[in-house]
UniProtKB/Swiss-Prot annotation:
<dbReference type="GO" id="GO:0042147">
    <property type="term" value="P:retrograde transport, endosome to Golgi"/>
</dbReference>
<feature type="compositionally biased region" description="Pro residues">
    <location>
        <begin position="397"/>
        <end position="412"/>
    </location>
</feature>
<feature type="modified residue" description="Phosphoserine">
    <location>
        <position position="104"/>
    </location>
</feature>
<dbReference type="GO" id="GO:0005935">
    <property type="term" value="C:cellular bud neck"/>
</dbReference>
<feature type="modified residue" description="Phosphoserine">
    <location>
        <position position="393"/>
    </location>
</feature>
<dbReference type="GO" id="GO:0043332">
    <property type="term" value="C:mating projection tip"/>
</dbReference>
<dbReference type="InterPro" id="IPR035551">
    <property type="entry name" value="Boi1/2_SH3"/>
</dbReference>
<feature type="compositionally biased region" description="Low complexity">
    <location>
        <begin position="621"/>
        <end position="638"/>
    </location>
</feature>
<dbReference type="GO" id="GO:0030427">
    <property type="term" value="C:site of polarized growth"/>
</dbReference>
<feature type="modified residue" description="Phosphoserine">
    <location>
        <position position="590"/>
    </location>
</feature>
<feature type="modified residue" description="Phosphoserine">
    <location>
        <position position="593"/>
    </location>
</feature>
<dbReference type="GO" id="GO:0007015">
    <property type="term" value="P:actin filament organization"/>
</dbReference>
<dbReference type="GO" id="GO:0099500">
    <property type="term" value="P:vesicle fusion to plasma membrane"/>
</dbReference>
<feature type="modified residue" description="Phosphoserine">
    <location>
        <position position="412"/>
    </location>
</feature>
<dbReference type="InterPro" id="IPR013761">
    <property type="entry name" value="SAM/pointed_sf"/>
</dbReference>
<comment type="subunit">
    <text>Interacts with BEM1.</text>
</comment>
<keyword id="KW-0728">SH3 domain</keyword>
Length: 980
């Protein structure tokens, strides 16, 4: 063809072969038919048009024509001779040169027979060298090391480590997929001896560039693609077979390797690459580079985890350390019943470190000095941990390493939050401080002693005895949740009674036999952090003393309290929390504000014991403890709801400050409090929380109406005293919990929002009777309406339609609309096949045989702004005429014509003004009348007989009349149908 001759005459380019991957049938004469597998020889590419259409020859059908390039795939490379490196090019060096490590699948195909021979020879040589290296690994060069340890590898120097690892990775990749890369280079003798590793470190595992000057080999490692320069990016795409003009776009737009990895398919259009096919191929290459980087990083991690090298010890994450000397001293001082063998083993573990696999480092000074010591013999594991006392506190196994949190203070390794889930709990690890230091305060609040077996738990491990009145020897933080003697009478005498009550209450819990509760010890005040946590979790919703109508959700607050307490608590020491420190650390003081606000508004304890604060006795020394000790909520005796002594704070009455009588009263009222389920708060039932609050509140008001006035007076007195004490202090500051209470007062929970609270009811509902609404309605009548849900309840309602306002009444006697539906931009449709089940259900209930639905507009549409809930509404009527009437009325109401926008028609015929058109119409009518008159005259002149459909013979015509031209022009052979 002429196009082919012109192209070949220029001799500008020679194109590679392509293979068809999809079938293409030509739609025009100059196109080319293709089937999958056809070889296409490119004659002209889309260099002039950049439209993705090539001109080529189908070698199967010998036809030529245009075809889309995306239907084909390249099977040959433009310059394949530059990609191969001859085996003799570096004869003096035994290194390995590879081609492109992750070439695209488009470069895999058929090449010439000579190239295939070289490829198969290279592949065979590579595989034989790999097999030879594997044999040497098993037998020859590493024979001595493997005899000691099966995973022992020869020690290599630090510069050789990276090259050796890269070589192992390349071998693994070639074994997994030998046909993935179309570029193979021959390999030399592969040996893992020390000399060969030195040669390998000198060799460059890289990709050769396809630049015309192939003497300078660029380092194009796919793993280092992020550090490529724009020139290296250009060289890479030139290497994989893209034309030079496309590759130069990356250099022109300064696309580095980091930018290249962030490019998407739509970004390539900004590089002035107009062909979609080329952009798609480049995007596939970018994905191949990303996958190569990901696979190399994954394989590198897998390979490095197999070998434990000395120079990698500093790169690993620091593991949890255990001071075995201190543990050994504690075990030897506290435990005298250990056997001689276990004591010998423990004494030897202090001097000679216990060997573990390199993945778990017990001591930061742990090093692998001897190959025999690097791997722990698995036969010794049962012997090492045969003694049960090893894993008892404080000799249990170390905590796994964890990343430090930037916002959380350093916690002790004594307890991991991972072990507190449900029943899978472990005994907490404890560390005993010296005698002259403060007692241990546990960050997560689990103290290892049992409340049920306090007599039996004094054998091996004991906590030091402490005096509750000595503030110097007994300094407790907030998380210990103790109740000191602040203006109380005989508090120490009341503590055993509290312990008895708590032990009786906790004995009914199904999980009280777990390890945590067996090793659980209470503080001297009779409570523990476990009880505090259970108490917080069972707290009723906080209600203000002054605005009882407002509600607050306690579950989130209690969780925040526990989290803040867990952050604030220290391990080896404790200190008093002063108000000045609270100013600096507002988050740490949130738990104080939480309990102080509870104590002010609800000053009663679950056991009817009340602690009051005398403002006159609140000195600066004791004020630091007043916020945490002004309440009596730290005594929780059960996590179970059935046997809980926890009652709602507003349901209990105040009692005088007498600890003995109060505790006895609480002990006697335990069954009654457990039976009074209306007074027990149920925070887990979030859906009906609001409803249950009001029910319990009304029941309590009815039952305790006599004590109402005295309770309110005592509350006001208590609050006024505490308020005066805090206002008098200059250090008083409003806590975040109080701000939260005020902010949440005006916010209703979303779950409590009902239909009556929507804008349709608050703004759109009219107070009008059904009969009055019928008079002005476009359509009205009885219909059945389906409720919400898949199988909602069908209810009979009386509907009235006013424009796009569809309202309904429960009956015709209603004086107010019960519901409203805004049908703006809705579509009314009959029930389709998908709604057949709904229609059958409505018909089976006798609600109506004919069903239709109202479909709201699509979300986000301009006309879809309705003030009612946009959902599908189903209606049913009894007969067909009613359904037609409703459909007609609703369709008319939903037709939306915007009269503010002029109507623009696509009819492009030129028009004339209306006045001119009317003048022409009058002229046309006059011409029509004149024509009709002439026709009547012609009929009379010829004497046409209509009955016989022929000219009347009574009117003869002379021959000479036809010879005159005037007569011919005037007569013009008139017929009844008009002129001819």
């Amino acid at each position: 063809m002429s196009l082919e001759g012109n192209t070949l005459g220029k001799g500008a380019k020679s194109f590679p072969l392509y293979i068809a991957v999809n079938q293409y049938s030509k739609r025009m004469e100059d196109e080319l038919n293709m089937k999958p597998g056809d070889k296409i020889k490119v004659i002209t590419d889309d260099g002039e048009y950049n439209d993705g259409w090539y001109y080529g020859r189908n070698l199967r059908t010998k036809e030529e024509g245009l075809y889309p390039a995306v239907f084909t795939k390249r099977i040959a490379i433009e310059k394949p001779e530059n990609l191969h490196k001859s085996p003799t090019q570096e004869s003096g060096n035994s290194g390995v040169k590879y081609g492109n490590l992750n070439d695209s699948a488009s470069n895999i195909g058929k090449v010439s027979s000579h190239q295939q021979e070289n490829r198969y020879t290279s592949l065979k040589s590579t595989m034989s060298d790999i097999d030879k290296a594997l044999e040497e690994l098993r037998s020859g060069s590493v024979e001595q090391e493997v005899s000691k340890s099966p995973t022992r590898v020869p020690e290599v120097s630090t510069p050789q480590l990276q090259d050796e690892q890269t070589l192992i990775q390349e071998k693994t990749r070639n074994e997994e997929n030998t046909t993935h890369d179309s570029l193979f280079s021959s390999t030399a003798d592969l040996n893992l001896s020390s000399e060969s590793l030195k040669n390998i470190s000198k060799s460059n595992i890289s990709t050769k560039s396809l630049e015309p000057s192939s003497e300078s080999v660029r380092q194009l490692d796919l793993k280092m693609a992020k550090s490529w320069s724009p020139e290296e990016v250009t060289d890479y795409f030139s290497l994989v077979g893209f034309d030079q003009s496309t590759c130069n776009k990356f250099k022109e737009h300064q696309v580095s390797g980091k930018i290249l990895l962030e490019l998407e398919l739509e970004h390539l259009k900004e590089l002035e690459i107009n062909s979609f096919g080329i952009r798609f191929q480049i995007f596939k290459e970018i994905r191949n580079i990303k996958s190569a980087i990901d696979s190399s990083s994954n394989k590198l991690d897998a390979d490095y985890s197999t070998f434990a090298f000395e120079n990698q010890a500093a790169q690993l994450m620091p593991a949890a350390t255990v001071n075995r000397d201190e543990i050994q001293q504690q075990i030897s001082s506290k435990c005298n019943k250990l056997s001689s063998e276990s004591s010998d083993r423990k004494s030897s573990s202090v001097t000679t470190e216990l060997q573990r696999p390199s993945s778990v480092v017990v001591n930061p000074n742990f090093k692998l000095h001897d190959p025999a010591e690097q791997i722990l013999d698995m036969t010794e594991v049962p012997n090492l941990f045969a003694d049960k006392d090893i894993f008892e506190s404080p000799g249990r196994a170390p905590k796994p390493p964890s990343y430090p949190s930037p916002v959380q203070p350093p916690q002790s390794p004594s307890f991991n939050n991972r072990y507190t889930n449900n029943n899978a709990r472990f005994p907490p690890q404890t560390t005993y401080p010296p005698k002259n230091k403060n007692p241990t305060v546990y960050s997560n609040g689990l103290i290892p002693n049992s409340s049920t077996s306090s007599d039996n738990s004094t054998g091996k491990f004991k906590f030091p005895a402490m005096n509750g009145h000595d503030s110097n020897s007994r300094k407790t933080t907030l998380t210990s949740a103790t109740i000191p003697s602040i203006n109380t009478v005989n508090t120490d005498e009341s503590l055993p009674a509290i312990s008895n009550i708590s032990s009786n209450a906790t004995s009914h819990h199904p999980n009280r036999n777990s390890v945590v509760y067996n090793n659980h010890k209470r503080t001297e005040s009779g409570s523990s952090f476990v009880d505090l946590f259970n108490r917080i979790s069972m707290l009723s919703p906080v209600k203000s003393s002054f605005d009882e109508e407002e509600t607050k959700q306690p579950s989130k607050a209690s969780r925040a309290v526990f989290d803040s307490a867990r952050r604030k608590s220290s391990y080896g020491h404790s200190r008093d929390a002063s108000l000045s420190e609270m100013k600096k650390h507002r988050r740490n003081s949130s738990i104080l504000s939480f309990f102080s606000s509870k104590s002010q508004s609800n000053p009663t304890s679950p056991t009817k014991q009340t602690f009051t604060i005398d403002p006159a006795k609140m000195t600066s020394h004791s004020r630091s403890q007043s916020n945490s000790y002004s309440h009596a909520r730290s005594q929780s005796y059960s996590h179970s709801r059935k046997h809980s002594l926890v009652t709602s704070p507003l349901k209990t009455s105040l009692s005088p400050i007498n600890s003995k009588s109060n505790i006895a009263l609480a002990h006697s009222e335990t069954p009654t409090s457990s039976n009074n389920k209306e007074a027990v708060s149920q925070p887990s039932e979030g859906k009906h929380k609001h409803k249950h609050k009001h029910k319990s509140k009304h029941k309590h008001k009815n039952s305790s109406s006599k004590d109402g006035s005295s309770e309110e007076k005592s509350k006001k007195k208590l609050f006024s005293s505490t308020k005066e004490s805090f206002v008098g202090s200059k250090e008083f500051k409003r806590s975040p919990s109080e701000l939260t209470q005020k902010s949440t007062k005006s916010i209703l929970p979303r779950s409590n929002a009902k239909k009556q609270q929507t804008s349709a009811f608050t703004e759109g509902i009219r107070s009008i009777t059904a009969k009055e609404s019928m008079q002005t309605a476009d359509c009205s009548g009885w219909m059945s309406k389906k409720g919400t849900g898949a199988m909602g309840t069908w209810k009979q309602r009386f509907f009235t339609l006013h424009g796009t306002r569809l309202s309904y009444f429960t009956n015709t006697n209603d004086e107010k609309e019960r519901g409203l539906i805004d049908i703006t931009a809705h579509r009314v449709l009959p029930a389709s096949d998908d709604d057949r089940l709904i229609s059958l259900y409505a018909a089976s209930l006798g609600k109506g045989k004919y069903c239709f639905k109202l479909v709201p507009p699509q979300p986000g549409s301009k006309k879809g702004l309705t003030f009612t809930e946009p959902r599908v509404h189903y209606f049913a009527v009894e007969n067909k005429s009613e359904m037609k009437a409703w459909l007609s009325a609703i369709i008319k109401a939903t037709i939306d014509i915007d009269t503010s926008v002029p109507v623009i028609s696509s009819y492009a015929t030129p028009t004339i003004p209306l006045s001119k058109a009317q003048t022409l119409l009058e002229e046309a009518r006059l011409q029509t009348q004149l024509r009709d008159a002439e026709e009547e005259e012609g009929r009379d002149q010829f004497g046409w007989d209509d009955t016989q459909n022929k000219r009347n013979s009574n009117y003869p015509i002379e021959q000479d009349q036809f010879e005159t031209s005037d007569y011919l022009e005037s007569s013009a052979f008139e017929y009844p149908g008009g002129r001819l």
